[in-house]
Amino acid sequence: MFTPSITTTSDAGAGIGYSSIRVRGTDPSRINITANGIPVNDAESSQVFWTNMGDFASSVENMQIQRGVGTSTNGAGAFGATINMQTEKIGTKPYAGVDLSAGSYASHKETFRFGTGLIKNHWAFQGRLSHIASDGYVDRASTRLDSYFLQGGYFGENTVVKFITFNGKEKTYHAWNYPSVYEMELAGSRRYNSCGEYYDEAGNVHYYKDQSDFYHQQHYQLLLNQIITPTLKFNAALHYTKGFGYYEEYKSGRKLGEYGLVGAESAYFKTKTDLVRQKLMDNDFYGAVASFDYDNRQNLRATVGGGWNRYDGDHYGLVKWVKNTEHIADLQPNHRYYSNNGDKRDANIYGKVSYEFVKGLSAYVDLQYRHINYKMDGPTDDFNGTTQQVFDLEQKYDFFNPKAGLFYQINRNHSVYASYALAHKEPTRNDFEDNINTHLRAEQLNDWELGYKYQSEKFSAGVNFYYMAYRDQFVLTGEQNEIGEFIARNAGESYRRGVELQAAWSPVKWFRWDANATWSHNRAKDWTVTLDDGTAYNLGDTPLSFSPDFIFNNIFTFDYRGFRAALTSQYVGKQRLSNTGFDYYVSEEENGNHNVSMVLKRHFITNLDLAYTFRMKGVKRITAGCTFYNLFSAKYFNNGWTAPSYKKDGNGKVVAYTSSDRYETGYAVSAPFNVMGHLSFEF
């Protein structure tokens, strides 16, 4: 993904399993992702869980990443960034293919692809079947992913109708606790994983074998493209996604009352025991999108469209096993201890006009209205010490999101552009649950972009300046809830500003050099923390979490007579785990204070991919190769959390601290040097 301003994370350490991307420091829940123009983000969390769409990249023909506010045509919730994926076009000729990969940490992938080609000049079908598995770099961080992709289409002179279905089934062992450096040192390994850990009566450590996430997601899309006249087109789509799954975990020392195993009046309400619980989700997401596109093929293009989506999801928890049942009068199988329903409806309409005033100079205006109605009701999994929190909520939002821009093609080599966009985004389910009894406000973003591009036969370059001014931006605090999800809260006024550079040079046919870099300044203007005496303290202007000031990417590509080599490097600057600006907290211990880091240190990694493509009788094409990841075995962390306390020291200065506790910062480790071989056959 060779795009400026991007960083990635991986729970398992080697890229297979739970992973995510951040764009310009924007967390994944603020990145709008679509497939064929249809929303992929989970409607409640706004996240995309890529493990639920295993090997989907093998069925993607084109991926457009738009930094900043995306256009209305790229989805209802375009906000901090947009990723629009177009699945593969159905080819006119039949084919079959097999892709095989295997490498470090017992990682392997098997993919079978086929296409029928055009049948009777109108019909065609295409498909993919995939299996991915890995034990992960982190201990027990195994992943098993099974998926398919199928599409069939009718192709007429003016009409194209396609039906697409794809799914994903995953089983992933938990690795979201992110241990502290101190825990890694005690364990004698940076691969240490505390998820599933428990002790028997003799004090021996064990790991629960089913401490895993299980999920099945099924997608259906029906797409219509109709040419009405040479200048007018109609596009429409229906979609439905079914999701069901759960995660199972061993919990030590939990109160019987917390899980409704005894009544509130019971003398054993606070009695603790070990148990196994499941948290389940059963949801349906469906809707429709449509648009009319007009192009007079001279100087005017216009689009009018909209969409409607509904999400209906049940969240509930089951107790599967209890170690000590002597105080439980009647333990039912699959005892349900909470049940909450979320119902979210989202509608939007938009209009976009692009007009070329004179040759080379054009402008566009994009206006969108969006309405959201979000309801939640029933007890949640949040226990307040007395009972499960009942979360009855209904919120309605109405957003007007205007955008406008100018583009000037100076000549065949030079062009400039400028744009402005106003965007809004509602809080996620996690935002509401993690901030119960707090008045949450929708986010607002004013995004200004200004850029220049140069394009010639052998060299291209571009520079983009951006200023993203937020009001009530939800920023990650650095803290996690008990299932490893990051907690966010409104930041008041904040901003992200920077410059992005891109360049590519290909002096000869067999060599290409690509590079990009981002310099940025990301700040919260008035970040407050709660001191240990309960008072709020304003830290003033502070750096935003997970937002490096500098990112650099570089690729050298050699391609000669079937042999291809690509040397890829990335440098990522320091990232703070909180919004306080503190680089460390002080663990106050009897034998002296100990400073514990609260940052992701800068890192530089290099990957090398080698491949050779050749032909054999009976086989159209064979490609064999090997990818060497983290070539110089850099030891770095790709993600983390921190949750110290804050107080004023003897000089009245606010400091981050804990009382003899080095466990309040944890890290996701990345794998050192590792290898993945790959072999592909095309028939």
Positions of PLM-derived features:
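Membrane-embedded beta-barrel scaffold of Gram-negative outer-membrane proteins
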Residues: I227, T231-H239, F407-Q409, S415-A423, ...
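C-terminal beta-signal and adjacent terminal beta-strands/loops
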Residues: Q570-V586, Y612-F683
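Face-selective signature of the C-terminal outer-membrane beta-barrel domain
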Residues: Y215-D381, Q409, N413, S419, ...
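A beta-strand signature from Gram-negative outer-membrane beta-barrel systems
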Residues: D55-G97
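Extracytoplasmic beta-strand/coil segments of soluble accessory domains associated
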Residues: F2-P39, D55, E61
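Gram-negative outer-membrane beta-barrel transporters
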Residues: Y467-A469, R489-F582, S680
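Short acidic/polar hinge/loop motifs at secondary-structure boundaries
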Residues: F2, P39-R67, Q86, E183
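Transmembrane beta-barrel wall of Gram-negative outer-membrane proteins
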Residues: A102-A133, V138-A175, Y215, Y220-T231, ...
